[in-house]
Amino acid sequence: MSLSNQEKIDIIAKFARAEGDTGSPEVQVALLTFDINKLQGHFADHKHDFHSRRGLLRKVSQRRKLLDYLKGKDITRYTALIKELGLRR
C-alpha cells in the first residue's frame, strides 16, 4: 500500500527545492498526499479495515500539521503547493 521506491524518487524530484532535498515541507506534504490517495483507493475495496484507517488518519493529521507550519512560514510557498497538489484550501 505504500509508495514504491521509484514513485518516491519521482515525487521528491518534482517537489524538491534543491538537489538532494528530501526534508522540506513541500516534499513531505507531497509524499503524504500521494500515500493518502493510495490508501483511499484501498478503502474502496476494504471498507472494514480499521487498522489501516487509523494509519490513514495519522497521515492526514501529519500533513495538516506540516501545511499549517508552511502557511505560517511562507504563505506563497503554501498556496503554490496547495494549488499544485489540488488540495481543498
Curated annotation (Swiss-Prot):
CDD domains according to UniProt: Ribosomal_S15p_S13e (cd00353)
Q: Which Pfam families does this chain map to? A: Ribosomal_S15
State the InterPro entries in the record.
Ribosomal_uS15, Ribosomal_uS15_bac-type, uS15_NS1_RNA-bd_sf
Q: Cross-referenced SMART domains, in alphabetical order?
A: Ribosomal_S15
Q: Which GO terms describe its cellular component?
A: cytosolic small ribosomal subunit
- Gene Ontology molecular function, alphabetical: rRNA binding; structural constituent of ribosome
- Where on the tree of life does the source sit, at the highest rank? Bacteria
Mind telling me which Gene3D superfamilies this protein's record contains? 6.10.250.3130, S15/NS1, RNA-binding
Q: Which UniProt keywords apply?
A: Ribonucleoprotein, Ribosomal protein, RNA-binding, rRNA-binding
Please give a single GO biological process term from the UniProt record: translation
SUPFAM superfamilies under this entry? S15/NS1 RNA-binding domain
As for what it does, the entry says: One of the primary rRNA binding proteins, it binds directly to 16S rRNA where it helps nucleate assembly of the platform of the 30S subunit by binding and bridging several RNA helices of the 16S rRNA. Forms an intersubunit bridge (bridge B4) with the 23S rRNA of the 50S subunit in the ribosome.
What PANTHER family does this protein's entry cite?
RIBOSOMAL PROTEIN S15, BACTERIAL AND ORGANELLAR (PTHR23321), SMALL RIBOSOMAL SUBUNIT PROTEIN US15M (PTHR23321:SF26)
Q: Spell out the family assignment given in the record's similarity comment.
A: Belongs to the universal ribosomal protein uS15 family.
What quaternary structure, including any partners, is listed in this protein's UniProt entry? Part of the 30S ribosomal subunit. Forms a bridge to the 50S subunit in the 70S ribosome, contacting the 23S rRNA.
Cited HAMAP family: Ribosomal_uS15_B
Give the protein's recorded name. Answer: Small ribosomal subunit protein uS15
Which organism does this sequence originate in? Pseudoalteromonas translucida (strain TAC 125)
